[in-house]
Amino acid sequence: MSGSRVAVRLFVRLLAGALLVGKLWAQPPAHVIELTADRDSRYKIAGLRTPEITVKVGEQVILRVTANRGKSWNRDGSIHGFSLLRAKDRTRVDGWDLLLKPGKQEFTLTAPSEPGEYVVVCTVICSEEHESMHMKFTVLP
């Protein structure tokens, strides 16, 4: 067998091995969540009567939000908030304290490292119904 054929075969094997290793190390696809923070002080997810989010521990999450202006807003132009709190003690989860401006926005986040029940709350006084702007958020092991 000639030296060039050996080199080609070796190259093909190395390339196949690199592709296999790349697949094994590749990140799983992100969990995409599309929701609306609406003018009636409600979070809404298409197809769900009661909005609820379920993710896995440490999962990458792409949050696509359409925010519609309510009756009031912050001086910085934020019209709604999206903050994740632990349900058991109402402490905020780092990285999940978002201020929403009018229109469409996208956030790349990492799901909490602790499984359990959480709650999403609006942190901008958006209307008289602001206190009812919340939804369940579950993190699975």
PLM features: residue spans?
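Bacterial N-terminal signal peptides that target proteins for export
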Residues: 2-14
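Extracytoplasmic copper-binding redox domains, predominantly the cupredoxin/blue-copper superfamily
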Residues: 25-141
